[in-house]
């Protein structure tokens, strides 16, 4: 919903250019689509982009930047905007004018919100229609059924969306507060894990599209549930791969092993391999970047099937937090010493086995470690 803003707004002398002539409405627009739009937006079309920007007191250039950031299509000067579009512009611009956000940050807010909700909206509509096996009335098409479904679900989903957003915002704010210093709010030490389905490309050639979609959905759903349940954060899903982060190495290790164990018990799933690295990570717009992330990805590519490889920094962190012994020999010595003193031996959740050093593209020579559970260990039910 962007426009060509050349020549729009005020010029260098403060003169306001005349309003562009509105484009004629598309006579081919589906009446049902227009009714559905009116239902969802809760208002009728009243403004062209130029009129909306002027009503909001925002320059055409800034309005266009916001709309592009939100992912809206170019509509020229068609009368397609509502009072809500004006209010949204006014609010974003107001945050900038009040000094609460810089202009660049306001654009980032618009972009992150647009990208997230665009995917959410596509997923919800597809899921609702896919799950509809029988129309409410005989002879109704799926297209015709969309209106009553949206009419019933819209208010409930809107409230649910705000609830989940507030919960996620509280959790994210809590992580920032716990980071302690200002530098760690953007650049933090995290454990980052990649989980990758082995042989996915070959599967795409053998499986029907519907079967492939079901497999990917099952993988993403299972991964998301396990990551969240164990206290990690799912950063993103890439079809055959998921990226997650955790504040501590023990949590990341537990998630990785549970993912491998869970997928191994599902006969419909290919083998899984996981790579984890620990170190400084830059966070931007919900994503993570940096050498640590790249290393985790490279470790995944060299990991054996149904196995977890970690980097040296991650192994050292597990040893430091007493989640894993430095070696099995060291664990045996500690157990013997504890027994001699009549004390309980230390209990470790994980075991680490150093692997051969090997070159990794773009990162030089690394020493991966194989992560497993200690004998007698196991994931929580």
UniProtKB/Swiss-Prot annotation:
EC class (word): lyase
Binding positions for Mg(2+) per the UniProt entry: 196, 240
Protein name: Adenylate cyclase
Keyword tags: ATP-binding, cAMP biosynthesis, Lyase, Magnesium, Metal-binding, Nucleotide-binding
Organism the protein comes from: Streptomyces coelicolor (strain ATCC BAA-471 / A3(2) / M145)
Cofactor: Mg(2+)
Listed GO biological process terms: cAMP biosynthetic process; intracellular signal transduction
Entry's cofactor comment: Binds 1 Mg(2+) ion per subunit.
Similarity comment text for this entry: Belongs to the adenylyl cyclase class-3 family.
